Structures are given as C-alpha cells and as structure tokens.
C-alpha cells in the first residue's frame, strides 16, 4: 500500500490518497480525515487492526502521519 498525505504548517491534513486497499473504505477515510489535525487523527486511528492482521489501512495512515510530522 502506498499513502500520499500532505498537511499545512498548522498540522491540518490537506490531502490523503491511498494506492491499494479497499477503495470504498479508503475514500471514506480520506474524506473524514481531510481538514483534521494530525494528532487528532492519530489518537483516533492508531492501533486499529484488520481481522487477524496486526495493522490496518487506518493504522498505516497513522504511521504515514507520524513520518510527515518528523519532516
């Protein structure tokens, strides 16, 4: 899965797109998190699992957001 995410100088998410994963669910996630603060999204989505997998698309988005904050 590839995640492209951008945020402004106030850590407000401006754009998110995923390559791979469940298209409908990911479109919903993108719309819900756009305009939200990075830390708020991480607090809500970190640690979500997908079935027996240790991670999920929302959890992977959190990892991408954490990397973005480090830039």
Task: Indicate where each model-derived feature is located.
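Active-site- and interface-proximal helix/loop "cap" or "latch" segments in soluble metabolic
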Residues: 1-71
